[in-house]
């Protein structure tokens, strides 16, 4: 008997929408995908012309009403990357979308695919009343996978045998957790003392600098590159992990309440078990003192951004 199709609703406008849907189609997920955007009809028709080649999934134009029984809502907002669009206007737009989404009785998972995603996730939680485990951002999922690949290349082994994490927020506010990085079961830092021909402190420093240059969200650089493919690849992967209930450990943006010594709840990227219900379990790493200090500083930055928005709006409840 064929499995019931899952339902994905894409709300908000972004130049990533179509590429994200295309990447999901390549995964052959049995899904109904709805685009809630007044300019989506052309995109939907384009996908439907090729429907012979993606029979597992169907694509439709829709309204916010489609959120009522959606498994996942993917939340885009290109205005977050637009310098001409004020922070206050962005908050108003987020609130409007969330209220429309929740008015349908939505109770699924929200994937936040915007710039400043941890701030947006906190706003979505506040405006929606959804449990924190049902709101997830891309966090440092891309940076972590790239980190593992680069280490694998240094040691000339498979990335599948590298266990390491990038945590924090995005852009420069990320932390390579060297104290918890392993090749198989062997700590990578042990190679600095035992096998400096294979890896040096300079190698680690260069890799750390490289990781901070990974864009947190697509932007256009001087060559016109918007770094879209890497973003939608991890977004589609996260979608698959949830819809297939894979219970995988991913470094994504989740609300941390008491772990890591943080003083108040904040969305930040750390390892968590992700499945059909969203965040199944938070995995608290045993960080070094320096890593712990850096994480607290990053969490404070996110909290301060939310406080500024609250002051500017006279309260954002």
Where are these regions (language model features)?
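Short, well-ordered alpha-helices that flank and scaffold nucleotide-derived cofactor binding pockets
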Residues: 22-26, 49, 126, 153
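Structured loop/turn residues at beta-strand edges in well-structured enzyme cores
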Residues: 28, 68, 130
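NAD(P)+-binding Rossmann beta1-loop-alpha1 motif at the extreme N-terminus of oxidoreductases
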Residues: 1-44
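C-terminal substrate-binding/catalytic lobe of Rossmann-fold NAD(P)-dependent dehydrogenases
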Residues: 128-134, 143-317
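Rossmann-like NAD(P)-binding element
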Residues: 53-108
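Rossmann-like NAD(P)(H) cofactor-binding subdomain of soluble oxidoreductases
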Residues: 85-150
């Amino acid at each position: 008997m064929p499995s019931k199709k899952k339902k994905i609703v894409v709300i908000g406008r972004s130049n990533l929408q179509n590429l994200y849907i295309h990447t999901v189609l390549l995964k052959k997920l049995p899904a109904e995908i709805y685009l809630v955007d007044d300019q989506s009809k052309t995109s939907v028709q384009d996908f439907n012309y090729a429907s012979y080649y993606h029979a597992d999934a169907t694509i439709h134009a829709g309204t916010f009403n489609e959120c009522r029984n959606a498994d996942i809502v993917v939340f885009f907002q290109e205005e977050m990357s637009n310098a001409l669009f004020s922070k206050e206007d962005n908050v108003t737009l987020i609130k409007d979308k969330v209220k429309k989404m929740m008015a349908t009785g939505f109770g699924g998972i929200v994937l936040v695919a915007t710039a400043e995603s941890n701030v947006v996730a906190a706003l979505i939680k506040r405006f929606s009343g959804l449990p924190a485990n049902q709101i997830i951002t891309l966090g440092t999922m891309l940076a972590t996978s790239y980190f593992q690949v680069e280490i694998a290349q240094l040691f000339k082994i498979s990335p599948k045998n590298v266990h390491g994490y990038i945590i924090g927020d995005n852009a420069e506010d990320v932390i390579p957790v060297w104290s918890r990085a392993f090749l198989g079961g062997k700590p990578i830092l042990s190679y600095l003392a035992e096998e400096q021909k294979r890896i040096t402190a300079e190698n680690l420093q260069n890799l750390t600098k490289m990781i901070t240059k990974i864009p947190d969200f697509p932007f256009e650089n001087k060559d016109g590159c918007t770094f879209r493919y890497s973003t939608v690849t991890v977004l589609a992967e996260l979608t698959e992990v949830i819809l297939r209930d894979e219970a995988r450990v991913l470094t994504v943006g989740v609300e941390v309440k008491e772990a890591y010594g943080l003083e108040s709840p904040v969305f930040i990227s750390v390892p968590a078990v992700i499945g059909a219900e969203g965040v199944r379990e938070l995995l608290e790493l045993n960080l070094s003192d320096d890593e712990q200090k850096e994480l607290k500083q990053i969490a404070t930055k996110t909290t301060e951004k939310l406080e500024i928005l609250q002051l500017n709006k006279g309260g954002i409840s």
